[in-house]
């Protein structure tokens, strides 16, 4: 099961596992500041933060699984099959296709606080990359050294949850993942 996790000491760490038996042709991918993102519904973005992460590059476009930008903001998409439901394009909102979501946030936001502002005016849509790449059903962890949030787009709309543990797995929905932590409340660490 894929898992994204944060770890804080005097430094901040962000990472994820990608538990597949085969490769989709993914590779470590760097998107420099001057790479032009051509968003399907929002046009071109020519100046942005640099991004590094794991992606499959198709037609010159990085389809990120997870990444971190130069400001230390990290983001990972994990399977959410059967629960993800994207919206239709809506006038007056910033319409972002699910495959553009990671670069949309990481290119423009330097913190989770700033990402929350972008999420407040964003509409996550199911526009496909092409006929070979249907919209992936995902939910996301966004984190920096201060906080983490989980983003889910369901039939109820776009939900942003505070994520106090800084961890996200594939299904089930985030609220159920948090509830299931009760199964482990008797575990503790000690110096003994």
Can you name each region flagged by the protein language model?
Residues 1-94, 121, 126:
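A contiguous strand-loop segment
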Residues 80-82, 111, 122-124, 145-148, ...:
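Short acidic/polar capping segments at secondary-structure boundaries
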């Amino acid at each position: 099961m894929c898992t994204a996790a944060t770890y804080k000491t005097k430094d901040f760490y962000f990472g994820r596992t990608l538990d597949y038996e085969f490769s989709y042709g993914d590779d470590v991918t760097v998107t420099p500041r001057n790479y032009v993102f051509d968003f399907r519904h929002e046009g071109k973005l020519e100046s942005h933060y640099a991004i590094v992460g794991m992606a499959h590059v198709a037609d010159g476009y990085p389809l990120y699984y997870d990444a971190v930008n130069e400001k230390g903001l990290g983001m990972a998409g994990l399977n959410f099959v059967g629960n993800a439901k994207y919206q239709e394009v809506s006038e007056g909102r910033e319409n972002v296709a699910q495959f553009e979501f990671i670069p949309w946030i990481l290119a423009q936001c330097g913190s989770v606080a700033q990402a929350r502002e972008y999420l407040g005016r964003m509409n996550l849509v199911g526009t496909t990359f092409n006929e070979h790449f249907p919209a992936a059903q995902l939910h996301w962890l966004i984190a920096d050294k201060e906080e983490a949030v989980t983003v889910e787009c369901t039939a109820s709309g776009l939900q942003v949850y505070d994520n106090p543990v800084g961890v996200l797995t594939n299904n089930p929905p985030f609220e159920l993942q948090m509830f299931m932590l009760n199964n482990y409340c008797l575990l503790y660490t000690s110096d003994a």
